[in-house]
Design a protein with these regions (language model features):
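A short glycine-/small-residue-rich loop at the edge of a beta-strand within enzyme catalytic domains
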Residues: 26, 30, 34, 59-69, ...
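Oxyanion-binding "anion nests"
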Residues: 73-118
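A transmembrane helix-and-boundary motif of multi-pass membrane transporters/channels
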Residues: 1-64
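Conserved catalytic-core motifs characterized by acidic clusters
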Residues: 16, 20-23, 52, 56-58, ...
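Soluble C-terminal extramembrane regulatory/interaction domains of multi-pass membrane proteins
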Residues: 101-214
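Membrane-embedded hairpin module used as a gating/binding unit in multi-pass transport
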Residues: 42-52, 64-89
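Hydrophobic stripe of amphipathic alpha-helices that form coiled-coil interfaces
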Residues: 49, 53, 82-85, 89, ...
């Protein structure tokens, strides 16, 4: 009986290795990267809008930001398919830490999507080109570009860690710096600036937490 049990276990292992579908990690990785870069592009668009001295198409900006929700949903579906494919696959154990890390990244991207939607809505509803030269608005735009840079750098670093690439792409742009200090509220556009500051604060905090592996 012992021999029969061992033979049965060996057969089950072979069947598991041969018959069980492979781990579906490539679609999830591809969806995550596409979503991350789309989020980064959205922050770059906000930065460009804040620096514009011409009329800004706020409705288009907001529509593009809202479209990111579909990216997040597709990535969520791909991650669900990945996790489902690991349940019966013994070779998937090595991916557990990577999956947990990517779940954190997806949560970060979800927060960033919500924040860039908020910033885009603020621009659509309240932005006036006359404030493009305001120092605080300029800092918010700079920080939005830094967030975009940070998102791209984070997802590319993951690819390097996973062995999906051997080099880090050269990305132009500075990393996040210190939070923005406001000496005193703007006498006219304090609502606009306050809303932008809060969204960019939450975005940078979420990105910094993910970058630190929290």
């Amino acid at each position: 009986r012992v021999v029969e049990t061992l033979i049965g276990a060996a057969c089950a292992l072979v069947i598991n290795l041969v018959v069980v579908p492979p781990v579906q990690h490539e679609p999830a990785e591809r969806a995550m990267r596409e979503t991350a870069y789309a989020v980064a592009d959205a922050y770059d668009r906000v930065a460009a809008a804040l620096a514009s001295h011409d009329a800004v198409d706020g409705e288009r900006l907001l529509a593009d930001a809202r479209a990111l929700r579909a990216h997040v949903q597709r990535t969520r579906a791909a991650m669900d398919a990945l996790e489902e494919s690991t349940r019966l696959n013994l070779r998937a154990r090595a991916l557990r830490e990577r999956i947990a890390r990517d779940e954190r990244l997806l949560l970060t991207l979800t927060v960033l999507v919500n924040r860039v939607i908020g910033m885009s809505r603020t621009v659509a509803d309240r932005f006036d080109a006359s404030v493009a030269d305001d120092p605080i608005v300029h800092r918010v735009g700079t920080e939005a570009r830094r967030i975009a840079h940070g998102v791209r750098m984070l997802v590319d670093r993951h690819a390097l860690e996973d062995g999906r690439t051997t080099t880090m792409p050269a990305l132009d742009g500075p990393a996040l710096t210190t939070p923005i200090a406001v000496p005193q509220p703007h006498p006219t556009h304090w609502v606009l600036i306050g809303a932008l500051l809060e969204d960019v604060r939450q975005a940078r905090e979420s990105l910094e937490a993910d970058g630190a592996g929290e």
